[in-house]
Amino acid sequence: MFLNGQGGQRPPTVASPPLNVRGSISSDFNALGRSRNNSDAMDIYTITDRGPAAERDPAAGRWHANGSPSINSTSSKNPDRYPCYQENGRTYHGYRKGIYMLPCDEQEQDRLDIFHKLFTVARVSDGLIYAPHPTNGRFLDLGCGTGIWAIDVANKYPEAFVVGVDLAPIQPPNHPRNCDFYAPFDFESLWALGEDSWDLIHMQMGSGSVASWPNLYRRIYSHLRPGAWFEQVEIDFEPRCDDRSLEGLAIRQWYQLLKQATEETMRPVAHNSRETIRNLQEAGFTEIDHQMVGLPLNPWHQDEHERRVARWYNLAISESIETMSLAPFSRVFGWPIERIKQIAADVKSEAFNKEIHTYNILHIYQARKPLAN
C-alpha cells in the first residue's frame, strides 16, 4: 500500500506484517545485545565461500564480480587508523571525521539498542524483517550500529549469512559464527560487496547520515539478487499533535533547528515518505510497500499496547534530544554547550508532559528488485 505520511490522523502504534514474517526479538532491555556470548566469528571470505556463487581468486586476494565481496577485512577492522575524538563531552569516531553527527560512545550504543527494542515492540510478530526472505539467505545490514539487528537475525537463522557495516567499529567482538561486521565502512563510498549477491538488504535510522538517497538506492538495487528485497525503517521526527497546536512549544522549535542544521550539512535528518517512494521507484524497485506507525512521546493513550510503545519511545527520545543536537547546533550554529543543554531540557520536559499528546511517525518500507527477464 502507498501512504504519503504527510498529515492526516495519527496512524496506529502497531504495524502488521504485509508479507511473510520471520525473525527474533530480545525479551527485555537487559537483553538488548549486552550479553552477546557467541564467539569464533567468521571472516567475510568464509561466509561468502559458503554461499552458492563464491569463487575466490587466491592470487588477487579478492572475489570475482559474480556476487561475492571484495573487501579487506584487516584494514576494515583496524580502528587505530582512525582514532576517536572528544567533543562537547562525547566521543566521536575519527573515520570520515565530522561528517556523521552522532557520537559512538557507550551512551550512544545504549541509545541505539533502545531504538532497536522500540522497533520490535511497535511492529507486531518479532519485528525484525517483514520482507520475504530465505532462512538460509545472505543479509546485509547498512549502518548496523551496535550490530544488534544483525545478531538477532543471525541467531534466528543459523543457516543464513549476515554482514553488518558501519562507520564506527562499535560492534561486539563475540557474535554468532554466521555473522560478521566491517567497520569503519562508509556505505556512501564505493562498495566492494558483490553485486547481485544479497537476498535482503536492511537499513534503519539512516536519515541524517545520507547525502544522496537516489545514489544509495541505486547501489542497494545493484547489490540485490533479482527478486530480492530491501527493507528500510525510518522515524520522521517532526512533532505532530491532533488535538492542539504545537506553535510556541520547545519541541517544535527544536525540530525546526535540527532540520535546518542538518540540511546545511547536506545530510538532512528530515524524512519525506513521498520522496522515498519516488526515489525507490526511480532506482528500479517494484512492489513497494509503505507502512506508518504512530510513536507517542509519552504514555497518554488509554490503549495498553500504545502505552507500552510510548514508554519505550519516551525513553528513546529522552536519550536522543541532546545527543542529536550537540554536533549540529555547535558545529553549524556555533552554540555553546549550555544553550544546547537548555533547549534539550525544555524539549524533554514537554515530552514527559502527558497533557501534550505529541507523536512522531515510524515509516517502514519494503521494495523488491524485479526478477530477471
From Swiss-Prot:
Its EC number is 2.1.1.-. Keywords: Methyltransferase, Nucleus, S-adenosyl-L-methionine, Sporulation, Transcription, Transcription regulation, Transferase. GO terms for cellular component: nucleus. It is found in: Nucleus. Residues 1-21, 53-81 are annotated as: Disordered. It is an enzyme of class 2 (transferase). Residues 67-77 have a biased composition (Polar residues). Signal peptide: none annotated. It holds the Pfam family Methyltransf_23. It comes from the Eukaryota. One of its GO terms (biological process) is methylation. Belongs to the methyltransferase superfamily. LaeA methyltransferase family. Component of the heterotrimeric velvet complex composed of laeA, veA and velB; VeA acting as a bridging protein between laeA and velB. Methyltransferase that performs automethylation. No other methyl-accepting substrate has been identified yet. Component of the velvet transcription factor complex that acts as a global regulator for secondary metabolite gene expression. Controls the expression of the cyclopiazonic acid (CPA) gene clusters. Regulates also pigmentation and conidial head morphology. This is Secondary metabolism regulator laeA.
